[in-house]
Amino acid sequence: HQFEKQEMIVVCKPEESKMWYEKLWKNTVDLFRSMDIPVRTLECCSGDLADLKVKSVDVEAWSPRQKKYFEVGSCSNLGDAQARRLKIRINGENGKYFAHTLNNTVVAPPRMLIAFLENNLQADGSVKIPEVLQPYMGGMKVIEKK
């Protein structure tokens, strides 16, 4: 099957790696929360980390239908492992050194759509439009059932 998603990739200095990791996963959390979708984060333990990953967090959205959270994104810090494989180096004051790389799945549209509809569906079948999206919907606050 085909799975589409939007990724954010960062190549940075090692000393910036922790800061970027925090920013990236918070971007995903903020995006979902701005659309009134409850989310939580789960930091992966070292035994569950895939190859190359130094640190990883999953972002999960609440599914009212399933009555549980499901994964909608993840963020990983790969340290310098991926940069070593790709030979990505930084010219620093003390010579060349390997960069750090980070990957963040910001959104997988099918999963976001599911979370959006489930969390904004009203009892009468209409869908509430979160305030952040209303300017893009011509000021519409609700999509009415026809």
Language-model segments: which ranges?
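TRNA-recognition modules of translation machinery and tRNA-sensing kinases, especially anticodon-binding
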Residues: 1-146
